[in-house]
């Protein structure tokens, strides 16, 4: 039987409780789930890639999936190219709303055409739908406490950023 290998990618800047929920739920469907932290040249990150990897790995220790989940980073490549190198059997994407669906439908088409790799979509739980990294960065930039929506270790790192600015 072929091993089921998934790949869930993002910038995770910062990591949210919504991301963790998708990772936990998706890991139940794979023998191995890679979580790829990728650099996005169109975004100005709060945290460098290595720090985001460190924060995700720490947050995962609180979930019971660390034996199945491996965090990887990549500075510059298409998700589908990484997926081919890792023998991924399915890409993992999350959908919070209709805007996500429209964007992901387009990506689904090209990913499937270029690699033949299917994409599995996980709907965000209703209470996690509003969460996204952009909103967390915006709220944090205006001095708002986002600790209810991000893992504790991420909240701690955001507070450190604030201290460094003083």
Swiss-Prot record:
Binding site for substrate: 11, 43, 79, 93
Swiss-Prot/TrEMBL keywords: ATP-binding, Coenzyme A biosynthesis, Cytoplasm, Magnesium, Nucleotide-binding, Nucleotidyltransferase, Transferase
Record's GO cellular component terms: cytoplasm
Cofactor(s) this protein cannot do without: Mg(2+)
Site (Transition state stabilizer): 19
A Pfam family assignment: CTP_transf_like
Protein's pathway: Cofactor biosynthesis; coenzyme A biosynthesis; CoA from (R)-pantothenate: step 4/5
Subcellular location: Cytoplasm
Enzyme Commission (EC) number: 2.7.7.3
Binding site for ATP: 11-12, 19, 104, 128-134
Principal location class: cytoplasm
GO molecular function annotation: ATP binding; pantetheine-phosphate adenylyltransferase activity
Enzymatic reactions: (R)-4'-phosphopantetheine + ATP + H(+) = 3'-dephospho-CoA + diphosphate
Signal peptide extent: none
Origin: domain of life: Bacteria
Any one Gene Ontology BP term: coenzyme A biosynthetic process
Keyword ATP-binding part of the UniProt annotation: yes
Record's subunit section: Homohexamer.
Biological role stated in the UniProt entry: Reversibly transfers an adenylyl group from ATP to 4'-phosphopantetheine, yielding dephospho-CoA (dPCoA) and pyrophosphate.
Assigned protein family: Belongs to the bacterial CoaD family.
The name this protein goes by in its record: Phosphopantetheine adenylyltransferase
Source species: Lactococcus lactis subsp. cremoris (strain SK11)
Lineage, opening ranks: Bacteria, Bacillati, Bacillota, Bacilli, Lactobacillales
Gene name in the database record: coaD
């Amino acid at each position: 039987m072929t091993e089921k290998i998934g790949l869930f990618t993002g910038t995770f800047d910062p990591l949210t409780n919504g991301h963790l929920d998708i990772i936990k739920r998706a890991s139940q469907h794979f023998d191995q789930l890679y979580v790829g932290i990728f650099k996005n040249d169109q975004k100005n990150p709060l945290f460098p890639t290595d720090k985001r990897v460190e924060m995700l790995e720490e947050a995962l220790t609180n979930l019971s999936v660390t034996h199945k989940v491996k965090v990887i980073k990549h500075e510059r490549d298409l998700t589908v190219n990484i997926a081919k190198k890792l023998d991924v059997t399915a890409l993992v994407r999350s959908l919070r709303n209709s805007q996500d669906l429209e964007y992901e439908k387009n990506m689904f088409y090209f990913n499937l055409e270029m690699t033949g790799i299917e994409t599995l979509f996980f709907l965000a739980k209703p209470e996690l739908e509003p969460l996204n990294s952009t909103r967390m960065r915006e709220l944090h930039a205006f001095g708002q406490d986002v600790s209810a929506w991000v893992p504790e270790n991420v909240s701690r790192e955001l507070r450190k950023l604030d201290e460094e600015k003083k």
